[in-house]
Amino acid sequence: MHAAGSSAAQAEMPRLRPELDRTDLVRRAQLGSVAAFEQLVLVVAPSVHRYLALRLRNDSEARDALQETLLAAWQGLPSLKQADKFLPWVLGIATHKAVDARRGRVRTSDADVELQGREDESAGEIRQAILTLPASFRDVLLLRYVLQLSEDEVAEALGVRRGTVKSRTSRARKALGERLR
């Protein structure tokens, strides 16, 4: 019974190989499966929301941009060529939606910065310093270190070459270090 029970339990646990599962979900969603896309949303939405919240500094705008991102992802899904690149592709869409959102608002002051959760003073200083960086530096740092994407995934999300990601990361870290001195 143990052998049969454990193999049945393993058959019911689809998350044994998450990357393969995600790729399979993308392929099924590309064929029109709403259920598969909903599962993808459950997997990627927290990371995309976190990125947008950090980028936009406003949770309400981040939620709106997340919805626009997911709608655009659903509509553009048939054009995605590599199913295993879904997250970087969605983050690329999110980057464009964040730019659109920032263009559409009038910035009143830095007092509207919304920080999620409790942070100690040094983490708050680091976050504030990151937010003062140019967008190209800030995006690379957020994607690379907060969302822990590889250099290749960051490059794909931002639509730039890997070498550009490396140089921006280096320059961003240097600029961040100068701001924190």
PLM regions and their residue ranges:
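Arg/Lys-rich amphipathic alpha helix in sigma70-family domain 2
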Residues: 75-85, 92-112, 119
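Internal acidic/polar
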Residues: 5-10, 15-22, 100, 105-130, ...
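Helix-turn-helix DNA-binding module
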Residues: 131, 135-139, 147-164, 174-178
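C-terminal flanking helix
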Residues: 45, 49, 70, 134, ...
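Short, charged helix-capping/linker segments at alpha-helix termini
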Residues: 15, 30-39, 49-68, 162
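Short alpha-helical "packing" element that flanks the helix-turn-helix/winged-helix DNA-binding module
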Residues: 126, 140-141
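Short helix-capping/turn signature of helix-turn-helix
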Residues: 43-46, 54-57, 142-150
